[in-house]
Every structure is written in structure tokens, then in C-alpha cells.
Amino acid sequence: MSSQFEQLKLLSVLVCDTGDPELVKSSESQDATTNPSLILKVAQEPKYQELLTEAIAWGIRQNGDDVQTLTFVLDKIQVNFGLEILKHIPGRVSLEIDARLSFNTEAMVQRAIFLSELFAASGGDKKRLLVKIPGTWEGIQAVELLEKQGIACNVTLIFNLIQAIAAAKAKATLISPFVGRIYDWWIAAYGDDGYSIDADPGVASVSNIYTYYKKFDITTQIMAASFRSKEQVLALAGCDLLTVSPKLLDELKKDQSPVERKLDPAEAKKLDVQPVELTESIFRFLMNEDAMATEKLAEGIRIFSGDTQILEAAVTEFIKQIAAQDV
């Protein structure tokens, strides 16, 4: 019997969720995803100093003011790590724009275009880049504009169906619903009632989105994310893509138990699902009605924003050190 990893690869595209290029290399995955939190964990490791220092030097050479230089450096760090990651996989990498722009459509569009152009200018193939945009109303409007310009988007921080429907209407390439964070909210709110994996709220949320998409022939891909256990991953076998931490990927490689398809487009077609009307007011009302989605979206933006600021502080210190050496 082959490993669960190999069996799962026959049902879903497996994606490695990390900022560490070496872990991507050993993951044997098709694609990779990263974010400021993941890059922060590895950016200051000695083995990646060259990626960091090159980004800082490049940013300084752009001759912007202090704020512009910091923006240049942060995006170049992402690009450098993204390109390094792409050396080890055949598919795509997802890079994220600054979460502090989450409620400014125009700013997100401009930043995503800059990131995409910087990626290409640094030697990357735009076809292998997904730009991660948060699943706010403003973010999804940015996605619609970006997709029309040929910039493929990954709508992240998806916590309920109305976000997924809005992203599909915007013709997003891909969405990332967060299994584990949904599960975390339910446990924190109502306690651990020993959810069976079939009743896991995070798994159920992604399953519902999958059913809706396949029922109505929506081409936007679903990449389930933020897993807390191998069991959650296996419960979504058949989802278009699964982005999984290196730790859980290793667990899948060590287990040879049978893997069963859980999500099937043909089965989704048979279900009685009604289309949901979408307007901005409906989106905002249904988000407001969903305490979990509202709270986890806000929390996710705060976490990514906070980690970006920590990374900024570290980069600022590096810039000061370089400036002092040049004096």
C-alpha cells in the first residue's frame, strides 16, 4: 500500500504551507503558499541571510523615502523567498499583499500590480504566481479588477459561503477557506464536545463551499487551508487543492492506511442547493450574522498585519546597520 500522501495526490493537488524553501523542497508538493507570519519565522535564519540582504540592498537602491524603501524591501523579501521556493516545485507560489490594506480596494490593486511586476522583473514567471488578497468586500472588488488584468488571485481568509460566492463572482482563480481557524473558534466558543471528524465545523464549511461551487459549475478553485490535524486533511480528500504544513505532510507520508475520496463533484451535482443572491448589502449583512466569520476575518487581518509590522521592525534595524556601515 502506498502512503496516504501518495494516495491523496491522486485526489487533490497538495500544496506546502511554509516560508521555508528547504521544507518545500522535501515536501514533494505541487504548489506552495506562504504569508508574512511564515516568512517571519525563517527570514532571519542564517541560511537565508542572502535573500534578506539582497532585498534590503535592492530596496535602498530605489532611492525612495523611508516608508517607500520599507515597502520595496518587504515586497522584495516575499519575491526572493517565492522565487527560491519555486526552484523546488513544478507549480505555483502564493504571495500576500500587506494586510493593512485590507479595506482599501485601490491600494490593494496597486500593491498587487507592483508585487506582480517585481516578481516578473526578478526573473519569475507570472503564470506561477498567485497574489493573496483578503476576503473582505474591498479585497474581493480588488480581485475582480486584478483578474481582468491577468493577475491571478488567491482570496484568503475565507470563513463562510458568502465570501466564497463573492470571490467566485469576481472570477478569482482560487480561494483559501481556513479549516483549522473555524474549528478553533467553535472550540473556544462552545467547548470541545468531541466533534467527530464528519461534524468538524471547519471541514463542514469547506464541504459546503465545495458543494456550491460544483453544483453551479464555478471554475474558481478551492484550496482548503489551516489544518490542525491529519484527520482534517483526509476529511477533505478530493478538494481541488489542500495546503498543508510540512509537519502534517510528513505524517501523511508515514501512514499507509487507505484514503477515501470525501468530496466528489458528481455527488455535489445531485444535491438540492439553491443559488444565493449577492449584493454588497447582502454580503455585509450575512457576514454580520456570522459571528465566527466576522471575528476570524478580523483576527486574521490583525495577525498578518502584526507580523508584517514585526518584520518591518527587523528590516528597519538591518537597514540602519547597513547605513551605519556605509558611513
UniProtKB/Swiss-Prot annotation:
Keyword Iron listed: no
Transmembrane annotation, as ranges: none
InterPro entries reported in the protein's UniProt record: Aldolase_TIM, TAL/FSA, Transaldolase_1, Transaldolase_AS
Keyword Cytoplasm: yes
SUPFAM superfamilies with a match to the protein in the record: Aldolase
One of the record's GO molecular function terms: transaldolase activity
Subcellular location(s) per record: Cytoplasm
Sorted UniProt keywords: Cytoplasm, Pentose shunt, Schiff base, Transferase
Gene Ontology terms: biological process: carbohydrate metabolic process; pentose-phosphate shunt
Pathway stated in the Swiss-Prot or TrEMBL entry: Carbohydrate degradation; pentose phosphate pathway; D-glyceraldehyde 3-phosphate and beta-D-fructose 6-phosphate from D-ribose 5-phosphate and D-xylulose 5-phosphate (non-oxidative stage): step 2/3
Coiled-coil stretches: none
Pfam families linked to this entry: TAL_FSA (PF00923)
Catalytic activity from the UniProt record: D-sedoheptulose 7-phosphate + D-glyceraldehyde 3-phosphate = D-erythrose 4-phosphate + beta-D-fructose 6-phosphate
Main location: cytoplasm
EC number, as in UniProt: 2.2.1.2
Residues at the catalytic site: K132
Domain of life, per lineage: Bacteria
GO cellular component: cytoplasm
Function: Transaldolase is important for the balance of metabolites in the pentose-phosphate pathway.
Summary of subunit composition and partner proteins: Homodimer.
PANTHER family: TRANSALDOLASE
Protein family per UniProt: Belongs to the transaldolase family. Type 1 subfamily.
Name this protein carries in UniProt: Transaldolase
Species in which this protein is naturally found: Chlamydia abortus (strain DSM 27085 / S26/3) (Chlamydophila abortus)
Gene that this sequence comes from: tal
